[in-house]
Amino acid sequence: DADTGYGNELNVTRTVREYERAGIAAIHIEDQASPKRCGHLDGKELIPLNEYVAKIRAAAAARHDPNFVIIARTDANAVTGFEDSINRANTALANGADIAFVEAPKTIDEVTAIPKRVKGPCLLNVVTGGITPDLNMADARDMGYRIAILPSLLTSAIMSACDKALADFKSTDMPPNSAHLPSVGDRFARFRADYWNEIRTKFHSS
């Protein structure tokens, strides 16, 4: 997620090169004005289409690896309407983007229409509690989406679990039942403590 590309076409050029150098496989750049907002919140503003196109063209030209994927995101649906979002997606694809990302469709009809009307591969953003209706991933594949991202899947679950644990502790004065939780060893193993312990053992000074 490269947001707006962090500036104009000059900044986008540098952003793409830095991301590619870091080993990133794909990048998405959007048409919001900076400072941007979450695509599922109100109050967004768009840059003009010609500025958006300039960024996409610069991004496509800046990559060295032809397999580095440029994803063009448009937030137009919430600002100027669904038709403009489709137009912006198709214009971005015609100017070098590999995948179109129409952010925040509001109805199942819009979700269904996007891969039919966009002239290239489409990405679906599934935000828990967001504007877009909940959708089974098998149905999304059948509609024609090539990629789906679920950016709030784990954060939402973590927030709910934390809220419940704190509420239970407040009401009972007891910590959660450890029988239902990972052990200390399991928690350290999840974050590869064994790897760091090997380094400690190998290089420990006596």
Regions found by a protein language model. Give the residues of each.
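Flexible C-terminal active-site loop/helix
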Residues: 169-206
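Alpha/beta enzyme core
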Residues: 2-168, 196, 202-206
